[in-house]
Amino acid sequence: AITWQAISKVNTVDAETLAWMRRAGCIQISYGVESGSEDIRTLLCKDIDQDQVRRAFALTVGAGILARAYFIYGSPGESAATIQATLDLMEEIQPLGAIFYILDIFPGTALYEDFKRRTGTTDDIWLERREDIPYFETDPALDAAQVLAFGRTLRQTYHRRLPAYARSIRLNDDPASRPLHADFLSRLALTFHRGDYARNEDIQDPEATAEVLYRRALDLAPDARAYLGLGQMLQHRRDTAASIDVLAAGLKHFPGDGAIGLCLAISWMNAGHFRRALDLLIPLEADPRARHFAGICRQALRET
C-alpha cells in the first residue's frame, strides 16, 4: 500500500477530510503551531487560535494519523513565560512528533521588512555567504545562550513527556477503522522499539511504551508489524514461550510473512524444537539468514 505524509494548517482540517486522507494512505500530518503565546503567533502572522490547534491535533490522532507539531523559539518577546506557554499548549495537544526551530528571518516576510528598517540593511546582504539570519542576532533583548537554553528546555521536556502522550492516544471508535488504527499504533510502536525514539536519551524506557502500543494494536486488529515487533521483544527477553505464542498467532493471520516465520523459527530453536524450526525455515531458504539457521537445525538434528 502507498503511504504518504502531508503538511497542513490547523484551521483547514475536519473529521471527514482526515478520515478520507487516512483511508488513502496518509500516516502523518505536520502542523505549524509555532508557539503557545498568542502574542508571538500574532507577530509571526499565524492566523490561528488555541482552540483550532487543540481541535486539529485531536481530530488527526483520532483518525489514526500521527500529528506532528512545528515549534519556533527565539521569537520577538520570547521569555521564560512564553516558553512555558508553549510547554503548556504542548501538554494539551500531545503531539506524537515535534520539531523545534530557531526563528530565522527570510525575505518576503514582515520580520524581514522590519529587520531592514531597524538595521538599515538592504537585500545586498544575500550577496554574502550566509544561509540565514537568526532573529535573535538582531534583537538586543535576546542572546545566543538564552535562546539555545530555550531550545533545550523545549526538546527535553517534550521527549520526557512523549511516552505518556503515546500511551494516552484516543482513537475514533469506528469498527471499520480498526485495521488502520492498528497499523498506526504498531508504526508508532516501532519508532519506540527500534527507531528514533529508541535512541533518544531523554525518553525513558522506550521499549515499555513500544510494548503497550504493540499490544493495543493487536487488541484492535491483526497487524503483522505488531506481531513481529512484540514477538522479537519477547524473544530478546528470553520469554520463549510467550514469543512463540505471539509469533504463531501472527503467522496464522499472515502465513506468507517471511519475517514472522523466521522469527518464530528462531524461537522454536531457542526452545530446542529444531524440527519445527526447520519446517519453517525450509520455505525461506532463499534468505541467507534462513539458510544459516536451517544449517544449525540440520546439524542439531543429526547430532540427536
Task: Name these PLM-found stretches.
Residues 1-3:
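A conserved nucleotide-sugar
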